[in-house]
Amino acid sequence: MAAVQQKHDWADDDELEETSTELPPPQKITNKDGSTTIIEYRLNDNGQKVKTTRRIRYITHREVVNPRVAERKSWTKFGLSVKDGAGPAPDTTSVGENIIFKPSFNWRQEAKDESKDPNAQAMKDKLKDKKVKCRICNGEHFTARCPYKDTMAPIGEAGAAADVAASAADEAAAASQGAAGAGKKGSYVPPALRGAGGAAAAGERMGGKYGERDDLATLRVTNVSEMAEEQELRDMFERFGRVTRVFLAKDRDTGLAKGFAFISFADRSDAVKACAKMDGFGFRHLILRVEFAKKAA
């Protein structure tokens, strides 16, 4: 009996076409040189198969570290960082630069050469019983190393007195010119120069009739923090009496304090109490230096 021949069904062709689009599984091959070859397949935007071959070599880097350091890295974190992973978190820890210290091999010889220098020994003997005093803030350090050398002028500096003298000379010259012009008919005379014989009238001083009293009750505060504000100084010194004026010198470019301020009281007795209490007071990690301001000549 002859075998029955099966008819070809067109639906079988569709199934074969669908199975042909399946991607082969990825392959991982270990080579003799220790590297690993990974073969992967994927479909691109046009539906075509793309074969990707990658060759990877694994290198193990071993580093000898201090066992105490390794032990600290394995400590369990606590507090707000209890859920953080291992290692330093960028939002709570800042990793600084690793500075390698390299000592000199001939440092003993350099120390001996320095000790044998006669000039250095003579200078040490000369300055043995002398105390170093800064000309800017009266601190016990050299003026060149003063932290306020770029922001404060030296106390009693000759340049400041010269500026005051120059300004007084300019005012005297202006007054003489105004008096000479007052004698001319029809010439304009400023209100400040109007008076008997063209003499300059005394202008109003800050504080009105208490101007002299204000000068005698003004304190000079040094070693002030760069982050200080005038309102903070006013709040501190108003505990001892009424404060009429607070002047905090600030840098024009950065807006930070220059390190000194002037506090004026209405009563000198209040200024005396404030000077006694606030001199040596700790403010923003610094020790304030409070003294009476020297009256300008």
Swiss-Prot record:
Biased composition, class Basic and acidic residues, residue ranges: 1-10
The compartments listed are:
Cytoplasm
Q: Compositional bias of type Acidic residues: which residue ranges?
A: 11-20
- Single GO MF annotation: RNA binding
Q: Which Pfam families match?
A: eIF3g, RRM_1
Task: State if Transmembrane helix is listed as a keyword.
Answer: no
- Alphabetical UniProt keywords: Cytoplasm, Initiation factor, Protein biosynthesis, RNA-binding
Using the record's annotation, list all stretches that form the RRM domain: 217-295
Q: InterPro entries given for it?
A: eIF3_g, eIF3g_N, eIF3G_RRM, Nucleotide-bd_a/b_plait_sf, RBD_domain_sf, RRM_dom
Renumbered residue ranges of the record's region Disordered: 1-35
Answer yes or no on keyword Cell membrane: no
GO biological process terms held by the UniProt record: formation of cytoplasmic translation initiation complex
Which residue windows are coiled coil? none
Where this protein primarily resides, as one coarse class? Answer: cytoplasm
Q: Which GO terms describe its cellular component?
A: eukaryotic 43S preinitiation complex; eukaryotic 48S preinitiation complex; eukaryotic translation initiation factor 3 complex, eIF3e; eukaryotic translation initiation factor 3 complex, eIF3m
Q: Which family does this protein fall into?
A: Belongs to the eIF-3 subunit G family.
HAMAP family per record = eIF3g
How it assembles, according to the record, is: Component of the eukaryotic translation initiation factor 3 (eIF-3) complex.
**PANTHER family hit by this protein:** EUKARYOTIC TRANSLATION INITIATION FACTOR 3 SUBUNIT G
Descriptive protein name: Eukaryotic translation initiation factor 3 subunit G
Taxonomy, top ranks, is: Eukaryota, Fungi, Dikarya, Ascomycota, Pezizomycotina
